């Protein structure tokens, strides 16, 4: 019996439906494979990072800037920390005429380096205040090279990105762009930092967690935006958002969600220094709060 027009329409519809089903199943299978691969990739990244081992926990010596260099090292030792980040403007040692790092001769820098090594400490970075011309920057990079650091933490002028990136390449030292708050730093907004990094292979980020809230920026959001570029962390807390006049509070007592930040850093595969840094000057010293922060950090990292 010949097929009626209705039967032909039904068969045509069935064929179309089968084709659509095949396409849908193929698409679903592809999506499943994609999500499985993504999950495996994330798991691989996470498992590849051991925070207790791969995060170099230490302190920025600015924390003890009211003390001599030797006294600062004593306090670092008392806190049980290993990695330090000095800066180029704090007085060094009486036997070096209390000169700043940038004023020292090569032999003076070697003496400072030997003192650090004798204490069993490691110095992989230094904070540079920078300068107005390339000669000033070159002098500071030269001192950083003699000190044996891997990167410098600094805030390069907007019109010197190219020249400072070139200097970094010449000296084999990375530049970790640091930020202060709005009105004090060009880099208060992570978008500016990303602009600086673009086209400058020697640039990365030193994320100061306690400064972003002063500009109304959530540190976790900034960390996510800067993923893949973070060289180091300045560990710092603050009591409230949108108040640039506030000084920091001990880590874990303010508004910053550190557990979420630590999870995000692990997810990103971050491996590098995490430096405690206090701007506040507790009396008689910041050492008690630093010890408190060390305990808090170790507790949080043990949960990752």
Give each language-model segment a name.
Residues 115-204, 213-216, 287-288:
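Active-site acidic/histidine proton-transfer and metal-coordination neighborhood
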Residues 86-88, 123-126, 174-179, 206-207, ...:
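Short beta-strands and strand-loop turn motifs
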Residues 101-118, 163-170, 261-264:
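Catalytic-core regions built around general acid/base machinery
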Residues 85-111:
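Glycine-rich, proline-tolerant flexible connector loops at the mouths of alpha/beta enzymes
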Residues 1-45:
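Bacterial Sec-dependent N-terminal signal peptides
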Residues 63-65, 88-90, 129-132, 157-160, ...:
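Active-site-proximal loop/turn and secondary-structure-junction residues that shape catalytic pockets
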Residues 95-99, 103, 134-138, 286:
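Metal-dependent catalytic neighborhoods of phosphoester/phosphodiester hydrolases
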Residues 39-61, 65-83, 145-148, 166, ...:
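Histidine-acidic metal/acid-base catalytic patches
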């Amino acid at each position: 019996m010949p097929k009626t027009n209705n039967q032909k329409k039904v068969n045509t519809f069935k064929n179309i439906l089968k084709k659509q089903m095949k396409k849908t199943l193929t698409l679903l299978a592809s999506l499943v494979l994609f999500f499985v691969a993504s999950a495996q990739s994330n798991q691989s990244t996470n498992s590849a990072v051991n925070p207790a081992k791969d995060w170099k926990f230490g302190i920025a010596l600015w924390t003890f800037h009211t003390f001599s260099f030797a006294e600062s090292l004593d306090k670092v030792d008392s806190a049980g920390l290993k990695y330090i980040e000095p800066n180029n403007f704090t007085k060094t040692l009486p036997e070096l005429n209390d000169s700043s790092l940038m004023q020292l001769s090569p032999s003076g820098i070697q003496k400072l380096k030997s003192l650090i090594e004798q204490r069993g400490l490691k110095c992989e970075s230094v904070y540079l205040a920078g300068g107005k011309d390339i000669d000033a920057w070159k002098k500071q990079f030269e001192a950083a090279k003699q000190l044996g650091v891997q990167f410098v933490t600094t805030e390069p002028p907007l019109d010197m990105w190219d020249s400072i990136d070139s200097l970094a390449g010449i000296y084999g030292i990375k530049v970790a762009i640091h930020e202060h708050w709005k009105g004090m730093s060009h880099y208060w907004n992570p978008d500016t930092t990303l602009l600086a990094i673009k086209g400058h292979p020697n640039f990365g980020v030193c994320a100061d967690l306690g400064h972003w809230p002063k500009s109304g920026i959530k540190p976790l959001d900034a960390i996510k935006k800067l993923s893949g570029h973070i060289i180091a962390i300045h560990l710092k807390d603050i009591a409230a958002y949108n108040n640039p006049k506030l000084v920091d509070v001990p880590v874990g007592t303010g508004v910053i969600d550190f557990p979420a930040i630590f999870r995000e850093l692990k997810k990103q595969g971050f491996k590098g220094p995490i430096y405690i840094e206090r701007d506040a000057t507790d009396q008689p010293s910041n050492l008690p709060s630093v010890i408190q922060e060390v305990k808090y950090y170790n507790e949080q990292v043990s949960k990752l």
